């Protein structure tokens, strides 16, 4: 689940938290659920924030021919194909997993659909 939805996270310092569906300015723009890479699962939420030079805190899955499913706040689903080979990571059952950078087009796409700036 997108860390910007539901109970407030102390880790969110740059993105707005959506407590209710009414708080989402454009429900078709922001995802609620995403498939997380098995090697990246470490808690119940999916964080998309900048972590130093590494773009990903949690890494999305690529189970669908180099693509990942996203469920948006308006209830539509998108299967998004990844552009960067760095996002398509084989499952190794090892944690942690680090991939991509803030300049990565896949990270940017995901980040832009996580929330809006501000608290």
Residue ranges and their predicted role:
Residues 1-119:
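Short, well-structured segments within or immediately adjacent to enzyme catalytic domains
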């Amino acid at each position: 689940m997108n860390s910007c939805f539901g109970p407030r996270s102390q880790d969110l310092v740059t993105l707005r938290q959506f407590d209710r569906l009414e708080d989402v300015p454009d429900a078709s723009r922001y995802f609620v659920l995403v498939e997380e890479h098995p090697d990246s699962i470490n808690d119940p939420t999916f964080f998309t924030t900048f972590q130093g030079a590494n773009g990903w805190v949690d890494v999305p899955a690529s189970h669908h021919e180099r693509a990942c499913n996203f469920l948006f706040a308006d209830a539509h689903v998108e299967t998004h194909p990844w552009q960067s080979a760095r996002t398509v990571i084989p499952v190794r059952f090892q944690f942690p997993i680090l991939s991509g950078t803030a300049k990565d087009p896949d990270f940017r796409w995901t980040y832009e659909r996580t929330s809006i700036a501000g608290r």
